[in-house]
């Protein structure tokens, strides 16, 4: 695996290998690189969980993290992302984790020698979040085959939903969608069934809630926080109807009492904090696999 750009680019075998490596890290596996290794985290959109968990993952692996601030870089002078990465490559940086507001920003960057990990591209994909979601689900249920999984909320604007719906169907899960119709596209019906949240709540194994992404909406929104919560959110009353072994997930940040009742965020069924914890281990696995492959290819080229 040279880069991690999208979930669609991963084979099922590669996904399973990453999940297994993450499990090993969670259970105490240690890993460092023999050669000095450098990473740069280039975030052009705000981030808490993805940014910090990648940095923790890098440091746990013994990777040296190079500071980068987009607002003080030469990109403010018109330098392209390609040329910025070419610079990073030239000075010896091995891997770049990038979050960008543009979908498919990585087109044309794949042939650079520096490895690229997509930390989220606009409304496109968020592969490391998708992998940590898979890791969390597999920890709970041991399989994806036959699981009923609900994806609820601002689906159209969610890169997490875009990544998850495709891979979960590939892995054998049955998907259900819910949320405002104007934030849903009929093309998603290729992956699952649209229902109201009340129609699905009693049947699903995983209730995956999505943040209302106000920053990606144009025009006036027709929902207040209270009205959205009442119509589309996981209220305390709805949560009481969940199956006994069902779990609640959310990629965060959470809008409490909008997508999910405040009292449910840290409830017994919630795996929201677990997802954050698992993010470090899956990102360690991603970096280890990519950097070891990069090292292997470099050695082959020297012979």
Swiss-Prot record:
Keyword Transferase: yes
Record field: transmembrane: none
InterPro entries assigned to the protein according to its UniProt record, in alphabetical order: Asp/Orn_carbamoyltranf_P-bd, Asp/Orn_carbamoylTrfase, Asp/Orn_carbamoylTrfase_sf, Asp_carbamoyltransf, Asp_carbamoyltransf_Asp/Orn-bd
A GO CC annotation given for this chain: cytosol
Binding site for L-aspartate: 77, 159, 211
Sequence positions that bind carbamoyl phosphate: 49-50, 99, 126, 129, 252-253
Reaction catalysed by this enzyme: carbamoyl phosphate + L-aspartate = N-carbamoyl-L-aspartate + phosphate + H(+)
Record GO terms (molecular function): amino acid binding; aspartate carbamoyltransferase activity
One BP term from GO: 'de novo' pyrimidine nucleobase biosynthetic process
Keywords: Pyrimidine biosynthesis, Transferase
Pathway membership: Pyrimidine metabolism; UMP biosynthesis via de novo pathway; (S)-dihydroorotate from bicarbonate: step 2/3
Pfam families per record: OTCace (PF00185), OTCace_N (PF02729)
Enzyme Commission number: 2.1.3.2
Tagged with keyword Oxidoreductase: no
Annotated function: Catalyzes the condensation of carbamoyl phosphate and aspartate to form carbamoyl aspartate and inorganic phosphate, the committed step in the de novo pyrimidine nucleotide biosynthesis pathway.
Matches recorded under NCBIfam families: asp_carb_tr, PRK00856.1
Similarity comment text for this entry: Belongs to the aspartate/ornithine carbamoyltransferase superfamily. ATCase family.
Subunit organization: Heterododecamer (2C3:3R2) of six catalytic PyrB chains organized as two trimers (C3), and six regulatory PyrI chains organized as three dimers (R2).
Protein's recorded name: Aspartate carbamoyltransferase catalytic subunit
Species of provenance: Listeria welshimeri serovar 6b (strain ATCC 35897 / DSM 20650 / CCUG 15529 / CIP 8149 / NCTC 11857 / SLCC 5334 / V8)
């Amino acid at each position: 695996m040279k880069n991690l750009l999208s979930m669609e680019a991963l084979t099922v075998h590669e996904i399973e290998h990453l999940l297994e490596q993450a499990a090993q890290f969670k259970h105490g596996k240690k890993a460092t690189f023999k050669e000095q290794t450098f990473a740069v985290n280039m975030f052009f959109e705000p981030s808490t969980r993805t940014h910090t968990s990648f940095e923790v993952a890098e440091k746990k692996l013994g990777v040296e993290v190079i500071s980068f601030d987009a607002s003080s870089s030469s990109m403010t002078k018109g330098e392209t992302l390609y040329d910025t990465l070419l610079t990073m490559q030239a000075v010896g940086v091995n891997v770049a984790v990038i979050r960008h507001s543009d979908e498919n920003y990585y087109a044309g960057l794949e042939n650079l020698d520096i490895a690229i990990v997509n930390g989220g591209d606009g409304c496109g994909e968020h592969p490391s979040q998708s992998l940590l979601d898979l890791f969390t689900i597999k920890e709970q249920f041991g399989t994806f085959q036959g699981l009923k999984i609900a994806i609820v909320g601002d689906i159209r604007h969610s890169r997490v939903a875009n990544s998850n719906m495709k891979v979960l169907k590939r892995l054998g899960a049955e998907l259900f969608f819910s949320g405002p119709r104007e934030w849903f596209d009929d093309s998603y019906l290729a992956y699952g069934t649209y229902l109201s949240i009340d129609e699905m709540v009693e049947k699903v194994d995983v209730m995956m809630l999505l943040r209302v992404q106000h920053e990606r909406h144009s025009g006036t929104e027709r929902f207040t926080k209270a009205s959205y919560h009442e119509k589309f959110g996981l209220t305390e009353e709805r949560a009481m109807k969940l199956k006994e072994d069902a779990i609640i997930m959310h990629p965060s940040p959470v809008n409490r009492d909008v997508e999910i009742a405040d009292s449910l965020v840290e409830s017994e069924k919630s795996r929201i904090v677990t997802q954050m914890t698992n993010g470090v281990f899956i990102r360690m696995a991603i970096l280890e696999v990519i950097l070891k492959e990069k090292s292997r290819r470099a050695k082959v080229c020297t012979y």
